[in-house]
Amino acid sequence: MGPRFQPDDTLYKRRNTLKVEYVPDDIVGRDNEIEEYEAALQPIINGEYPDNIFIYGKTGVGKTAVTNFLLNELRESADHFEVDLTVISLNCDGLSTSYQAAISLVNNLRGHENHIAETGHPQSKVYRLLWNELNKLSGSVIIVLDEIDHITDDTFLYQITRADNNGYIDNIQLGVIGISNDSTFREQLDAKVQSSLCETEISFPPYGTEELQKVLEQRAEIAFHESALEDGVIPLCAALGRQDGGDARRAITLLRKAGDLARTENANSVTTDHVERAQEKLEAQQSMDIMRDLTEHEQLTLYALTTLAAEGETPARSRIVYQRYKELCEFQGREPRTARRMRSFLSDFEILNLTLSEMEHRGQDGGTYRQHELNRDIATVVDALQTIIGEFGAHQSIIEYLPDSGEEFATM
């Protein structure tokens, strides 16, 4: 018997080009944004002081891809024209405070063996170390702060964008590029930070269907063999990506998942049926991720509705859901949130497409009330809520949906 895993290049030429991390040789569908961005970076090649640039738009609209593409081009131009340029990139995901951001930037600038501890330093010392590290550099320095909206206070942004004005740096021309998924982040900043960080603002709108189709056609040409995709595959991926908010990452991932599904089935080509089934799987996984990321009391509210669904008692009125939610809380001695707060959780679930609700009218005397039901099958929700079920106990109604009939779970 031969090896279990065999090379397979029937469909793909370069599957990796359908990964989020891949930066293409050319960016399509973002001509206007690239033109604005390029103009803002041009002063660096001229030997002039760079502008600070604020980039904003939803996830998957090309902000990071365009930034990486243009910075690669900028480095090549700097090498060609012998311009002294250093680019420092910092992803701010997980850096909720200015203190954390400043330490991360210090450690980014220092060699790994010279990293400082993440806690225990006076703030003044951290910034002194930061200025010392920056002053070891020369020429133009660009600091890229991706997901900048994760930093919840302004101190770091104020310090870094006004370092030259405040006399902290004297050997470099410093520019900052801030990238945010939150279009309202700018309005939340202190006025001084706004004026410093947002010298140039570039908005990235969601991709339209035609733009997504161009993006997908570019990737497909590199990733797949000729004739590997049937007619209609790319238009369908683009249309579904547009429905998901014009998210190019999502559309590219969908195309890759459809290709993987076709390869698993030993198909000779990728069809629209593969796309539709891949979309169903992605939506299911997205729902799982959303449910697992809910807060404890949000999960308990969803758990309460799920037990009612398992009993065949949905659609259920808000007060019925609240009664079951209180029972779950009281079983573990937790203080329940108010009924009003729990109703806000239910409203959020509907926005997230986890549940459905409708207003019920019972005539003049019966009043009006809202009823709720799951928009996902019970087994999927139970699977996503296993941690909270393990902590609070398995309600009798959902035992059959648990692994091994709930043997490892305490019952209520």
Curated annotation (Swiss-Prot):
PANTHER family: CELL DIVISION CONTROL PROTEIN 6-RELATED, ORC1-TYPE DNA REPLICATION PROTEIN. ATP binds at V61, G62, K63, T64, A65, Y207, R219. It comes from Haloarcula marismortui (strain ATCC 43049 / DSM 3752 / JCM 8966 / VKM B-1809) (Halobacterium marismortui). Involved in regulation of DNA replication. The lineage of its organism: Archaea, Methanobacteriati, Methanobacteriota, Stenosarchaea group, Halobacteria. Keywords: ATP-binding, DNA replication, Nucleotide-binding. This is ORC1-type DNA replication protein 2. Pfam families: AAA_22, Cdc6_C, Cdc6_lid. Belongs to the CDC6/cdc18 family. Gene3D superfamilies: 1.10.8.60, P-loop containing nucleotide triphosphate hydrolases, Winged helix-like DNA-binding domain superfamily/Winged helix DNA-binding domain. GO terms for biological process: DNA replication. GO terms for molecular function: ATP binding; ATP hydrolysis activity. NCBIfam families: orc1/cdc6 family replication initiation protein. SMART domains: AAA (SM00382), Cdc6_C (SM01074).
